[in-house]
Amino acid sequence: MSDLAREITPVNIEEELKSSYLDYAMSVIVGRALPDVRDGLKPVHRRVLYAMSVLGNDWNKPYKKSARVVGDVIGKYHPHGDSAVYETIVRMAQPFSLRYMLVDGQGNFGSIDGDSAAAMRYTEIRMSKIAHELLADLEKETVDFVPNYDGTEQIPDVMPTRIPNLLVNGSSGIAVGMATNIPPHNLTEVVNGCLAYIDDENISLEGLMEHIKGPDFPTAAIINGRRGIEEAYRTGRGKIYIRARAEVEADAKTGRETIIVHEIPYQVNKARLIEKIAELVKDKRIEGISALRDESDKDGMRIVIEIKRDAVGEVVLNNLYSQTQLQTSFGINMVALHQGQPKIMPLKDILVAFVRHRREVVTRRTIFELRKARDRAHILEGLAIALANIDPIIELIRRAASPAEAKASLIAQAWELGSVATMLERAGDDAARPEWLEPEFGIRDGRYYLTEQQAQAILDLRLQKLTGMEHEKLLDEYKELLAEIAELLYILNSPERLMEVIREELEAFKTQYSDERRTEITANTADINIEDLINQEDVVVTLSHQGYVKYQPLSDYEAQRRGGKGKSAARIKEEDFIDRLLVANTHDTILCFSSRGRLYWMKVYQLPEASRGARGRPIVNLLPLEADERITAILPVREYEEGRHIFMATASGTVKKTALTEFSRHVSGIIAVNLNEGDELIGVDLTDGSDEAMLFSAEGKVVRFSEQAVRSMGRTATGVRGINLQGEDRVVSLIIPRGEGDILTVTQNGFGKRTAVSEYPTKSRATKGVISIKVSERNGKVVGAVQVDAADQIMMITDAGTLVRTRVSEVSIVGRNTQGVTLIRTAEDEHVVGLQRVAEPVEDEELDGVVKVEGEVAEDDDAIDDIDGDDDIAEDDE
């Protein structure tokens, strides 16, 4: 024990950790996780293919047990577990993993549903035909060989591949402190890119991308957008979005829609995808799906998603794209080993490295073939000399006492050149001369001196070779070798010819293995201005109390006489009702203010378009709302102009003014106003800094004051008092009056009135205000107020989902302190909950006759009777 203790050497643990971890990290980076830029293979892939090659497990020979290959790999080349090696083999044999499979498998090698492959003792493999292109010319000293892990075997340091495999099949791996994720590409496109680079070494990225369009995945699908592709090709890093190929089919008889998915994104597990969709439907996070099934078979993939009758297929599909792996992102990180060091490789750098590798391989192959050709020519040269001097040589051999004496005599004597002189004169005296040949051998002083190898070949010559026909064959072979040597020398001495050879081989390779692109590349909102494709039109945007949002063309609604029954604006549940309604243009931005005082952005055209009877789509599926957060106010904005403000009012009477430019950066969820407990936003509007504001309360009060009484504040401020409310009273409407016009006020029970703006006096901020309309049992509380002109129309909506549109001109102008007239007939327990002004009314020829309603027809006189009989119009009285 004491002897052992004396052998212990103290070391600094910090230094030892640094050194050991660095050794481990470099071992993982260089020897395990990252591919070589030249052949696109990691060490384990290289060792598997080499072991199969040594084993003779070729594409045109019988399959061999996977376990046999795995045993050879871990026994000779890869000192790791058999499971890691077998998993590598399995992946190289899966048509959904590699764009061009390198292993031809027989048996169960797993599925796109995530099923595991059968054990290695059950499956059989052999190299695929294209895999041989990675090992082509390996025996011709084209690459360096290095010792295996125990020094008993030699393995290639890199494959002499004819395939730009790093791009063709891609690669992924996680090393220490770095990772790589290179997508597969179409072989034809990549080869065309290589050829374009060979033709013009200064080709731009744009020029290369004319040939290499983008990744081409084995599972096909669709790449959304080219920007991520270009960024990755330019810098080596980028992100692309892969979307499943799906189509919405409609039944001709029932009209019900069905989503059919034919292709899914790369590396997505189909079974888990279907489970996720089912889970989202069960949790009601995705609406509108009635059935889901997998009808995939040997003929291809087919996932069927049946849509409910009242749902819109495109909306459901977009929801699936956003919440499931029907759309995924692929982060491209093109890291590979370049000259033994990890490096981020843009597209052109990868092509340059591959072409440079091919140049080296072809050069080394040419040198090898030249050496072999010269060695063979050297022997044939000696045989030709023997045939030219056949009689003296036969006599010499007959006189020799032994083969050794005969060989020595052949070497010692000088011989006539014969026909060899003419051939060598054409090719050059040194053309076929091996580099190892000593000066005293070969042609010297017009005579020929044989080497030991030539003398032995002459002694081994069979008598039948002495016939005239065999003599001619020998000379013809020698001539062909001289021509081959001349061509090989031309390749070595001419860089242009060398690149021609590389080009010819790439062309031949492309002809043999080319195929069509599978993955479609489409433009998306990041590449084109989607607004250029959206028709500008005015639409009605509705948001229900339970958060269902939609828009529909304004033209869907026909103007009616006041007192009409109205048309249903939305199909809603009994416990739901329309909470917010506004008119906007499809190109406007909707600023969505939440109950928590946060602001979210959406373009109007990004909202779901639905029919008048449809519920729309939950806004929580469109905006990243937090738990218990709901949208309480929405405002359309076209441009973020300097000098303009957003003026906000809360139910408790607080007002706040913030510069519009502070909301121009579209980051969802930023704070718009700091709300007190129990308070909420009831209105927002745009101002120019010199406007006035009017706050209307549920108890019929109104205060009008100058906007300048409210200073501009930051987004996170709470605001100041706008009106002094009494008791449980709350603010229901905010109006920023424009011009003269009138104020139209509506109560819960469908009554309302029109009063000139000038009737409302301007007071100080934070006062109790004056009467806006009489609140009574007949009228109910105030629902809202809007500013109107005589040419306008108004929309009113009830908590039962009924909407009526009527002309403002049909509502009489009365004083401020009055009860008003009937604007909409409400059923028992039905109340008006929303009011909106509509400009530029649509002409309706039927309005001059009978009022058009759903379910019944009422004469005009019935609607007018209420004015003469029941309405109480009183003078202005504060």
From Swiss-Prot:
Domain of life: Bacteria
Name used for this protein in its record: DNA gyrase subunit A
Keywords on record: ATP-binding, Cytoplasm, DNA-binding, Isomerase, Nucleotide-binding, Topoisomerase
GO CC annotations, alphabetized: chromosome; cytoplasm; DNA topoisomerase type II (double strand cut, ATP-hydrolyzing) complex
Annotated localization: Cytoplasm
Keyword ATP-binding: yes
Reactions listed under catalytic activity: ATP-dependent breakage, passage and rejoining of double-stranded DNA
Protein function: A type II topoisomerase that negatively supercoils closed circular double-stranded (ds) DNA in an ATP-dependent manner to modulate DNA topology and maintain chromosomes in an underwound state. Negative supercoiling favors strand separation, and DNA replication, transcription, recombination and repair, all of which involve strand separation. Also able to catalyze the interconversion of other topological isomers of dsDNA rings, including catenanes and knotted rings. Type II topoisomerases break and join 2 DNA strands simultaneously in an ATP-dependent manner.
Enzyme class, first EC level, given as a word: isomerase
SMART domains: TOP4c
Oligomer and partners: Heterotetramer, composed of two GyrA and two GyrB chains. In the heterotetramer, GyrA contains the active site tyrosine that forms a transient covalent intermediate with DNA, while GyrB binds cofactors and catalyzes ATP hydrolysis.
Topo IIA-type catalytic domain segment(s): 34-533
Primary location recorded for the protein, binned into one broad class: cytoplasm
GO biological process, one term: DNA topological change
Keyword Hydrolase annotated: no
Motif (GyrA-box): 560-566
PANTHER family named among the record's database cross-references: DNA GYRASE SUBUNIT A, CHLOROPLASTIC_MITOCHONDRIAL (PTHR43493:SF5), DNA GYRASE/TOPOISOMERASE SUBUNIT A (PTHR43493)
Family designation: Belongs to the type II topoisomerase GyrA/ParC subunit family.
